């Protein structure tokens, strides 16, 4: 296996074309930031040292980088512009730490699909040919914005020309620089020490370091086997296009594993989601975070699940659930909102316009419609009538409601927590339950009906 001694991740850019007050590298891509994705791919190669270069909103980016890898060396780029200067700063810092030798990987952090396998292949090619440096390239149908790879007649790298410095013939070249390189550490140290800003942008270009590398040894080229993995994101149009292409791949991957995805164009599945064979995902579904869907479950249409476990045979229709567990054969929806912290047991129901938060619903219990259940435990085989509310908040504390098994809660009940309702209880419609109810009881509020005959509303009386 190819050895990686140092990795330098470039995360200094503002990303002005994103037109955002969020640094480009901290934008989300299918549940993770660009920077997180790149750092995860690099960290899987187990470099001895990993440096992250920051500049725009430096502390914000540095804080994110440390959260992804607490051992990362944070390097702040000064006011001198360019990727070459960014690498200079990293090299100087690593040299001060006496940690700069062997093979160095340089990676831009605006390629959210850059994968460990591609980086490993680059390092293997670099090592196999004993190169001074190796450039990762790709051939794109639309190379706009990328530096062009200019080869000599023998196919070797002649130079890399940035878009704004390229002439008409060079702009026709479709092989591009991906801004990913492998360098010998000593070669890189020499190369970056001689960089200048003699170009149209007045910046230190890292690509100029390859000229020095060519004087020392061979500069190789490794073409990426997967163009999608090395596509960068410069604006939100590119972000949307890359997200769509990635998501189609994800959906197709699950379909090949035995999952039915009715419409991949309208189904979004993040990378950490797990789905078992024979699950069915209907259009308009968004599966996020650590969501896991078991066999024979049916999700959708128009459903969002975030960090939610769906057990075998459960059905979730036109609903949203977050940080919840839905038991075997549970039926959720339509228009159910499960806020964080719910556990619904086997064959339970949370029906139309039901909201739950930190609720435990035991096997066979049903909350069919128009109810709020929060900070509550409802035991097995209980039915909760429509329009029922657990009034859990007293203005300071969230209080608990306990409802026993085989209970029939009437329509329009309000349970004022903290309160406990025992087993086998029946409550009358419209009851306000403020005090504990023992087992095997009937409870109802004495709300007398008053009828005023020949009544006229105010607007009628004023005529």
Regions found by a protein language model. Give the residues of each.
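Conserved N-terminal catalytic core of the sugar/cofactor nucleotidyltransferase
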Residues: 1-6, 33-109, 113-117, 121-124
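N-terminal nucleotide-binding beta1-loop-alpha1 segment
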Residues: 1-20
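Conserved alpha/beta core of the MobA/IspD/sugar-nucleotide pyrophosphorylase nucleotidyltransferase superfamily
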Residues: 2, 174-276
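Catalytic metal- and UDP-sugar-binding loop of GT-A-like glycosyltransferases, i.e.
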Residues: 10, 29, 107
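Short catalytic helix/loop segments, enriched in acidic residues and glycine
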Residues: 21-38
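Conserved core of the sugar-phosphate nucleotidyltransferase
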Residues: 59, 114-200, 207, 217-218
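Acidic, glycine-rich loop-and-beta core segments that form the ion-binding/anion-interacting portion
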Residues: 274-342
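Glycine-rich hexapeptide-repeat left-handed beta-helix
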Residues: 309, 316-463
């Amino acid at each position: 296996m190819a050895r990686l001694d140092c990795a330098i991740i470039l995360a200094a850019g503002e990303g002005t074309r994103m037109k955002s007050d969020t640094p480009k590298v901290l934008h989300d891509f299918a549940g993770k930031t660009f920077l997180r994705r790149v750092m995860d791919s690099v960290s899987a190669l187990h470099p001895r040292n990993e440096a992250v270069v920051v500049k725009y909103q430096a502390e914000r980016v540095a804080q994110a980088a440390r959260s992804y890898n607490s051992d990362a060396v944070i390097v702040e780029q000064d006011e001198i512009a360019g990727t070459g200067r960014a690498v200079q700063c990293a090299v100087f810092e690593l040299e001060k730490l006496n940690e700069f030798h062997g093979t160095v990987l340089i990676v831009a952090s605006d390629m959210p699909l850059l994968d460990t396998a591609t980086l490993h292949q680059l390092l293997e090619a670099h090592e196999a040919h004993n190169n001074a440096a190796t450039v990762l390239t790709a051939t794109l149908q639309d190379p706009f914005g990328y530096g062009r790879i200019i080869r000599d007649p023998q196919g070797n790298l002649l130079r890399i020309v940035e878009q704004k410095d390229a002439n008409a013939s060079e702009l026709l070249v479709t092989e591009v620089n991906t801004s990913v390189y492998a360098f010998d550490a000593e070669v890189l140290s020499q190369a970056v020490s001689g960089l200048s800003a003699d170009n149209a942008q007045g910046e230190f270009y890292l690509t100029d370091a390859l000229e020095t590398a060519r004087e020392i040894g061979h500069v190789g080229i490794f073409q990426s086997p997967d163009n999608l993995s090395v596509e960068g994101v410069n604006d939100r149009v590119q972000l949307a296009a890359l997200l769509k292409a990635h998501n189609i791949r994800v959906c197709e991957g699950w379909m090949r594993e035995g999952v039915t995805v009715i419409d991949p164009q309208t189904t979004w599945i993040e990378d950490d989601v797990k789905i078992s064979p024979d699950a069915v995902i209907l259009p308009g579904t968004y599966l996020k975070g650590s969501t896991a869907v078991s066999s024979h479950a049916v999700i959708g249409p128009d459903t969002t699940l975030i960090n939610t476990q769906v057990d075998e045979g459960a059905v979730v229709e036109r609903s949203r659930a977050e940080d919840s567990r839905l038991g075997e054969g549970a039926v959720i929806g339509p228009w159910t909102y499960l806020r964080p912290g719910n556990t619904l047991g086997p064959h339970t129901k949370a029906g139309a316009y039901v909201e739950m938060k930190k609720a435990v619903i035991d096997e066979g219990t049903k909350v069919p419609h128009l109810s709020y259940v929060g900070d509550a435990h409802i035991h097995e085989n209980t039915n909760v009538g429509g329009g029922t509310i657990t009034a859990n908040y007293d203005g300071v504390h969230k209080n608990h409601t306990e409802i026993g098994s085989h209970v029939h809660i009437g329509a329009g009940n309000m349970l004022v927590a903290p309160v406990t309702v025992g087993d086998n209880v029946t409550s009358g419609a419209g009851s306000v339950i403020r005090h504990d109810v023992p087992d095997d009881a009937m409870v109802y509020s004495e709300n007398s009906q008053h009828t005023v005959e020949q009544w006229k509303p105010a607007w009628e009386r004023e005529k």
